[in-house]
Amino acid sequence: MLVDGPSERPALCFLLLAVAMSFFGSALSIDETRAHLLLKEKMMRLGGRLVLNTKEELANERLMTLKIAEMKEAMRTLIFPPSMHFFQAKHLIERSQVFNILRMMPKGAALHLHDIGIVTMDWLVRNVTYRPHCHICFTPRGIMQFRFAHPTPRPSEKCSKWILLEDYRKRVQNVTEFDDSLLRNFTLVTQHPEVIYTNQNVVWSKFETIFFTISGLIHYAPVFRDYVFRSMQEFYEDNVLYMEIRARLLPVYELSGEHHDEEWSVKTYQEVAQKFVETHPEFIGIKIIYSDHRSKDVAVIAESIRMAMGLRIKFPTVVAGFDLVGHEDTGHSLHDYKEALMIPAKDGVKLPYFFHAGETDWQGTSIDRNILDALMLNTTRIGHGFALSKHPAVRTYSWKKDIPIEVCPISNQVLKLVSDLRNHPVATLMATGHPMVISSDDPAMFGAKGLSYDFYEVFMGIGGMKADLRTLKQLAMNSIKYSTLLESEKNTFMEIWKKRWDKFIADVATK
């Protein structure tokens, strides 16, 4: 309606008066509608439908008092760990009273872990590299390699002369400084990550170089056994009672040079876990998700899938399924491997998949569509699923199928998918209660340990001010629900977790 002549002015005045009267007349209904929408959002949030008992309500009140105080202080100072790079925020996180409570909390299971990134690198340096017969050499690119051998390994074109570390340490002036240099080569940690890691390809290159560097240490048979045991110990100390580990099952070697195959490795995982449970009876155990690298040809992946099928038949209680690992942006898409990935179905063999999918910022590409293909290939869980919120139809499909995403916030930040974790896309999914679990990917590579640091980032940053004890409880229970344990094992696990949870609640509520 045009209102620019004298005759139209009374009509305009009448319209404005009507709007004003409507606004003031409905002020109460606006408040009611606002309250209704806020309540609806509260119920939709992850854990929003959980009903807390009296002790849990008290514990929640105390936890939220601490959380709100820390967040208000952060809003005043603009120093907020989840908005900072983890390498620069870690020392601040460790001062947090909320973090100390999260460390106490029984977290259930860690369902997204990689085999040689889960034990603190300090242990590799201070313990493993001090063991007898440990040698070091350098590739033409200056990358470290390690090998245990007696006598000294023969030189090769791929590496410089092998040096016994015991002898080398006797020659260096400052052993502590040398060990610190080893530690720097075993992690991504740096004081200036934004300068050192200018883009995703740079950080991924260093990331995969670390795997290459430490592989010779971890895959020495005596170390391998100790490493598996220590991984369970470190997560157990962080109140995690079950682990599912992506493992490439690379050859494990003896001092003599003898090599063991994949079956030996799976059996060793099984035996070491049984040994750990003997002294930690509440620990549920571990399972392996056999994995191969997505840079390989289709024919190689087809053989790996057949290997996974065979291992799962021989070790049904240990081998959970199969996954593809590596940098999604530069590797093959799931669609590229479609024929190989269909082998189990064609052979009438059940091989569960746990695909990394959507660990990318490139929307609308074949990389991004891995999310869709993972679901079409009947994945059990989605590793990372960083891109899921950009695909509403796929998101709805995964929700209806009750297929969770495995969220690893620190990994996503360090590998440069997101800088400020308040802006992590999973915040939208948390707000609507999408199925998810929290895990830590390769915590040792990031200078972290266990699961608590990732829980902190989720609770304080991604979940915002409204994430509370209900959120934490739901995430812990989800980790049991979405594990690959049998229903009877899940029930046992839930009973053990519930006892620990009740004790945790009592401690928080009374101290």
Swiss-Prot record:
Residue ranges, annotated region (PRB domain): 127-185
Cofactor info, note text: Binds 1 zinc ion per subunit.
Main location (coarse class): secreted
Residue positions of the active site: E359, H384
InterPro entries listed in its UniProt record: A_deaminase_dom (IPR001365), A_deaminase_N (IPR013659), ADGF (IPR006331), Ado/ade_deaminase (IPR006330), Metal_Hydrolase (IPR032466)
Catalytic activity: adenosine + H2O + H(+) = inosine + NH4(+)
Name the record gives this protein: Adenosine deaminase 2
UniProt organism field: Homo sapiens
Lineage: Eukaryota, Metazoa, Chordata, Craniata, Vertebrata
